Swiss-Prot record:
It catalyses: (7R,8S)-7,8-diammoniononanoate + CO2 + ATP = (4R,5S)-dethiobiotin + ADP + phosphate + 3 H(+). ATP binds at G13, I14, G15, K16, T17, V18, E101, G102, A103, G104, P185, W186, L187. The gene is bioD. Transmembrane segments: none annotated. Homodimer. Its EC number is 6.3.3.3. It comes from Bradyrhizobium sp. (strain BTAi1 / ATCC BAA-1182). The keyword Nucleotide-binding applies. Catalyzes a mechanistically unusual reaction, the ATP-dependent insertion of CO2 between the N7 and N8 nitrogen atoms of 7,8-diaminopelargonic acid (DAPA, also called 7,8-diammoniononanoate) to form a ureido ring. Its cofactor is Mg(2+). InterPro entries: DTB_synth_BioD, P-loop_NTPase. It is found in: Cytoplasm. Keywords: ATP-binding, Biotin biosynthesis, Cytoplasm, Ligase, Magnesium, Metal-binding, Nucleotide-binding. It comes from the Bacteria. This is ATP-dependent dethiobiotin synthetase BioD.
Length: 210
């Protein structure tokens, strides 16, 4: 089976999709967002395609496309849709790696009684945890790491996003016993080229090897 990496986060709106685009490009991977909630603006798949300059055949179609920009369990209810977590299984990517992006944080509910964490535990694929660098990140990051490990999920490391914060980054990695993969800074002009350069300066492909 081709390499598969799950990208999750400590919260929503922290830059997880931008990092997923960067990782997809770095690995020459395909990309899959199992559940897209919010269709009025650019979807996460389209944003990743633009920022990673992906051909259409490297985008795996979403299993569910929901109109409301909300937690998947609520967006599905508003659309009158029933999400079946057991159907969230990506197709074969022909030997190419696959980057899978969750929604929001680790504990976001997919249904009334199923969390994304439950799906990650069933998949048992390694996870990259995206964490912001601003105030409050230590608590959120350590709780997320504890939740993942409580279900036996391997964590490749933490990808920090935001302005440099050496103490918070070091504290999270030391207390969380986790690898620091790098830090993706805020980019004044976010393009495929600027993202590629930022990733090349901070991240190593070897750190994501199976």
């Amino acid at each position: 089976m081709a390499q598969r990496i799950v990208v999750t986060g400590t919260d929503t709106g922290i830059g997880k999709t931008v990092f997923a685009a960067a990782l997809t490009d770095l690995l020459g991977a395909c990309y899959w967002k199992p559940v897209q909630a919010g269709l009025a603006e650019e979807t996460d798949s389209h944003r990743v395609q633009r920022l990673a300059d992906l051909a259409d055949d490297r985008l795996v179609p979403e299993a569910y496309r929901l109109a409301a920009p909300a937690s998947p369990h609520l967006a599905a209810r508003l659309d009158g849709v029933s999400i079946d977590p057991l159907c969230l299984n990506p197709p074969d990517t022909g030997g190419r790696p696959l980057v899978i992006e969750g929604a929001g944080g680790v504990m976001v509910p997919l249904t009334a009684d199923t969390l994304y964490l439950d799906v990650f535990a069933r998949w048992q694929w390694p996870v990259v945890l995206c964490a912001r660098t601003s105030l409050g990140t230590i608590n959120h990051s350590l709780l997320s790491l504890a939740a993942l490990r409580s279900r036996g999920i391997a964590v490749l490391g933490v990808a920090f996003i935001g302005d440099a914060n050496a103490d918070s980054e070091e504290t999270i990695c030391r207390l969380g016993a986790v690898k620091r993969l790098g830090r993706l800074p805020w980019l004044p002009e976010l393009t495929a080229r600027s993202l590629q350069h930022a990733v090349a300066a901070e991240f190593r492909r070897a750190d994501f090897a199976p």
